[in-house]
Amino acid sequence: MSNDEFSDNERLKQQSQLLRGTIKEDLHNELTGGFLGDNFQLIRFHGMYQQDDRDIRQERAAQMLEPLHTVMLRVRLPGGIISPQQWLGIDEFASQHTLYGSIRITNRQALQLHGVLKRNIKPVHRLLHQLGLDSRATAGDVNRNVLCTSNPVESRLHHQAYEWAKKISEHLLPKTNAYAEVWLDGEKIAQPEEEPILGNNYLPRKFKTAVVIPPQNDVDLHANDLNFIAIGDNGQLTGFNVLVGGGLAMTHGDQSTYPRLATELGYIPLNATLAVATAVVATQRDLGNRANRRNAKTKYTIDRLGIEVFKAEVELRAGLAFQPLRPYAFSSRGDRIGWVEGIDGKHHLTLFIPSGRLIDKPGKPLKSGLAAIAAVHTGDFRLTPNQNIIIAGVSERNRAQIDALAQRYSLIDDTVSPQRKSAMACVSYPTCPLAMAEAERVLPDIVDRLDAILIRNGIADRDVIFRVTGCPNGCGRAMLAEIGLVGRAVGRYDIYLGGNREGTRIPRLYKENQPLEEIIRDLDALLSAWAQADNPDEAFGDFAIQTGIIRPVLNSSIDFYLQD
């Protein structure tokens, strides 16, 4: 492929001096609060997205002002583990140096700080460095934050799996010194640099990796390019089943784009893990589509080449043959809210955090509560892919103190319904530049109305995996929900039905471009019919398929867009 056929993102990566660009110079440009030219894209590789407050965009334009530019910074936390001391440092920065004063737990076990002004960007990177953290490769065409199942009960296996998640993350990080040079005033490297795994043009598109511990599929493995499913023997990790090619993003009106479940390749022993991770990434690096970013993800590479060709290429590069898959099964995706005791005798408290947003509100000082717990906790915090937080490793002696703090700050709330615990939304408005419709801000009201429907039908103890995403890029993972809403325009969504509770089936389009009030009426009728079927063991997504409300998606590359 000639350079003329590459997308412009390939040009800017090629000319970026291994992700340096002119970011340092842009930091000193006080005429704008944003980043210009290629730097707008390049800062993503450093873990940031340029945004503005869309609620006041028109008002500022009327005043002849540029948009209120800020960045959203994403902290890299492989497996979602963070110490109380690290948490307190981030908490203080969020309170004092961001416009919104909040911390957001992402569904990829990272932390996001929204509303960081240009003058505070370098200080936040220095703070992260002092805390032993960074934001490298949490955005851009690289391997993103590596997920790991949040399983505090099986502590030995979880710890082993987490260690591998951390190893994979470090192994696949960009090797350029650009991050240290730009943000930490590190010494400039004199000798030529190379990116031995990612390549000097990096990957064709973002790449997501997860380590999964059955029977929990909290990481939503089918949203990821590369998955390592932990296989254990008597609580000891022995190897991984490898799955590739998952992904949920699509583009409205472009049927060459679609969500896709990951495909099984086979089993590998532990000592082959990094070789296989490298081989999968390198195969996508060399064979992925660099001309059309809409079709640049690993899922499209696999469907274009065929899974057997892709598998053979990975085996060749890794120098091995995949063994037959080991048995595994998933039973759930949700978090066990409340206290559980691990096999090590330590106690773990999982706290429900609505949409992962930690902020102090009247009667709900959640952010202050987590800071109060962090000040006395001697274990660690674990962020879950359901955007909750686990106070992990609490001794019997300290349990009462932690529980009292959680109660005092309303972090424990027994009135939260099962349905609210099973709902998820992306950030969307006001900060996401891609948002087409509300998501996080409208979710509480939608769930209130769903709860009312369930209560009226006598099934308040049941719930549906329900997700709202403000655009079709998939951050809210609506394409793995039993009911998913995908934003079309302000106040309007596509309705998808028929995913399952385990997260192993893609839902199908039920109705397109519906106003929210119509959606609530439709869901009222659907949930009422589910209740009247009077089968407590049948999940809603299964009910929708069994009764013919929607046809199952069997092979999304072929039948995702087929309609009755």
Swiss-Prot record:
Binding site for siroheme: C475
Keywords, alphabetical: 4Fe-4S, Amino-acid biosynthesis, Cysteine biosynthesis, Heme, Iron, Iron-sulfur, Metal-binding, NADP, Oxidoreductase
A GO biological-process term: sulfate assimilation
InterPro entries: CysI, NiRdtase/SiRdtase_haem-b_fer, Nit/Sulf_reduc_fer-like_dom_sf, NO2/SO3_Rdtase_4Fe4S_dom, NO2/SO3_Rdtase_4Fe4S_prot, NO2/SO3_Rdtase_4Fe4S_sf, NO2/SO3_Rdtase_FeS/sirohaem_BS
Cofactor entry: siroheme; [4Fe-4S] cluster
SUPFAM superfamilies linked to this entry: Nitrite and sulphite reductase 4Fe-4S domain-like (SSF56014), Nitrite/Sulfite reductase N-terminal domain-like (SSF55124)
MF annotations from Gene Ontology: 4 iron, 4 sulfur cluster binding; heme binding; metal ion binding; NADP binding; sulfite reductase (ferredoxin) activity; sulfite reductase (NADPH) activity
Cofactor comment: Binds 1 siroheme per subunit. Binds 1 [4Fe-4S] cluster per subunit.
Pfam families: NIR_SIR, NIR_SIR_ferr
Transmembrane stretches, start-end: none
Pathway: Sulfur metabolism; hydrogen sulfide biosynthesis; hydrogen sulfide from sulfite (NADPH route): step 1/1
Origin superkingdom: Bacteria
Gene Ontology CC: sulfite reductase complex (NADPH)
E.C. no: 1.8.1.2
Catalytic activity: hydrogen sulfide + 3 NADP(+) + 3 H2O = sulfite + 3 NADPH + 4 H(+)
Function: Component of the sulfite reductase complex that catalyzes the 6-electron reduction of sulfite to sulfide. This is one of several activities required for the biosynthesis of L-cysteine from sulfate.
Entry's family note: Belongs to the nitrite and sulfite reductase 4Fe-4S domain family.
Subunit-level organization: Alpha(8)-beta(8). The alpha component is a flavoprotein, the beta component is a hemoprotein.
NCBIfam families, per database record: CysI, PRK13504.1
Protein name (Swiss-Prot/TrEMBL): Sulfite reductase [NADPH] hemoprotein beta-component 2
Species lineage: Bacteria, Pseudomonadati, Pseudomonadota, Gammaproteobacteria, Enterobacterales
Gene behind this protein: cysI2
